[in-house]
């Protein structure tokens, strides 16, 4: 992806109500003409990906429909948010999908009110209570995880795990049971947006490997930290959590392919005083960052 620092960028937020409807009589609304800022974090086990969104100038009736009472943390509506980012040249790409866990209006930011949303990937699949699951005999771990993904309301993708489970019992929510099963066979389970992805140990997600250099969106210079190689870049939808990125830099020992173990997008649109459109990436050795828990 070429350096696109001077393109006009767009954020699009789709809000879907589990119950009720907006003023237009529909249960889903797309917002793309208001000032929006979004911080999206893609994280690995035991955490979940999350997003913090602020929308300015939202109609009062819409805010009323979406507002939750934050002091009742277990009373969460099954409202859903999808976030898309892009530009006129490269089109729009989904960068987040998850359950709204809190939403409220801030009227102290006058002259523009802002509506603040916190969302989490796989929320209901992580808190839904269910009975223990007993496997009598042998079952492929892919089939077992697929069943748990369905219970969690997520899509299932198997990227090459062929191991089996034998005579075992799993407890907890659908996602907890799926994670435990993957760990038991030495595989890795990723929850990303609508997908539950099963990976062989220490293998990156499939797909193209974006090349990142000063000519293709690298911002500043990479840093070597205890957590891995950390660097910033102009947002690129090809960056995928648990996927690879190829880095080219003059900083010694930072060039090469790294597995993305933490991915944070800071994105804004229609905000004259804030043009943030960047990603913060932490990369680690591809062969050491998988099921052994090298997510940070």
Segments (PLM) and residue ranges:
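Glycine-rich, acidic and aromatic/proline-enriched surface loops and short helix-turn segments
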Residues: 140-155
